[in-house]
Amino acid sequence: MTKVGLRIDVDTLRGTREGVPRLLATLHRHGVQASFFFSVGPDNMGRHLWRLIRPRFLWKMLRSNAASLYGWDILLAGTAWPGKNIGNANAGIIRETATYHETGLHAWDHHAWQTHSGHWSIRQLEEDIARGITALEAIIGKPVTCSAAAGWRADGRVVRAKEPFNLRYNSDCRGTTLFRPLLMPGQTGTPQIPVTLPTWDEVIGPAVQAQSFNTWIISRMLQDKGTPVYTIHAEVEGIVHQPLFEDLLVRARDAGITFCPLGELLPASPESLPLGQIVRGHIPGREGWLGCQQAASAS
């Protein structure tokens, strides 16, 4: 049996309102639990449109047929009008999710984090994280114990900025296996659970066709030599590609794969995890930098 952590990112108002309820129903039908990470502040995702001037981002949008994949309400959110507050508008849905699934913070403002966190000070990072955690805790009525950086925009500064919040784990980077981030010699931070597998929008196109994606990603899960962690998005697998995701759950079960919340991947003694660090890097299919796992020594 292969155990795969299932992470569900919720970036937008529509993803929360439409995608999450469908995913909750789908997961319930198949007896699967996952980790949901919510954006809870303003939905300004449409402001990413200016990135179309960048060739790699434009190619990604064309390759994934973004207009039909996400819908124009997502692609234009927060452009000609102020972005609506996601958490306030969907508190009931988020609360229901937290009743049945592990629930953590993705971002206060997904667009702002993805665009500006790379040059924010530690204080600015801490204030933004605190704002998101406070809002999410007010909605779900219990402490937030985990987080996942929006767009995997994380480095050593982000690791340090999250330390005051006493989280059980963070999932801020791409990598191969769980690790303890090294803050300084002799001091480690909150365990990291990296995403190890590509997302739909990173690979779909000339290399992998939509109709063969599930077969392809299942083979990657079975071949994963580390701790497999897979990310889906409420805006994609919860809306237009919900049937594809349901088919994935069936095929994965038949292949001996069991999905679980990320928190279930943590060992009883996190001190046994190897040391590592998060550095800025790039991966195929994703525009811009993102946090990547790198080995580190204790000295």
Curated annotation (Swiss-Prot):
The keyword Lipid biosynthesis applies. GO terms for molecular function: hydrolase activity, acting on carbon-nitrogen (but not peptide) bonds, in linear amides. It catalyses: 4-deoxy-4-formamido-alpha-L-arabinopyranosyl di-trans,octa-cis-undecaprenyl phosphate + H2O = 4-amino-4-deoxy-alpha-L-arabinopyranosyl di-trans,octa-cis-undecaprenyl phosphate + formate. PROSITE patterns: NODB. The keyword Glycosyltransferase does not apply. Pathway: Glycolipid biosynthesis; 4-amino-4-deoxy-alpha-L-arabinose undecaprenyl phosphate biosynthesis; 4-amino-4-deoxy-alpha-L-arabinose undecaprenyl phosphate from UDP-4-deoxy-4-formamido-beta-L-arabinose and undecaprenyl phosphate: step 2/2; Bacterial outer membrane biogenesis; lipopolysaccharide biosynthesis. Pfam families: Polysacc_deac_1. Residues 2-260 form the NodB homology domain. Its EC number is 3.5.1.n3. Gene3D superfamilies: Glycoside hydrolase/deacetylase. Keywords: Antibiotic resistance, Hydrolase, Lipid A biosynthesis, Lipid biosynthesis, Lipid metabolism, Lipopolysaccharide biosynthesis. One of its GO terms (biological process) is lipopolysaccharide biosynthetic process. GO terms for cellular component: membrane. Belongs to the polysaccharide deacetylase family. ArnD deformylase subfamily. Catalyzes the deformylation of 4-deoxy-4-formamido-L-arabinose-phosphoundecaprenol to 4-amino-4-deoxy-L-arabinose-phosphoundecaprenol. The modified arabinose is attached to lipid A and is required for resistance to polymyxin and cationic antimicrobial peptides. This is Probable 4-deoxy-4-formamido-L-arabinose-phosphoundecaprenol deformylase ArnD. It comes from Salmonella newport (strain SL254). The gene is arnD.
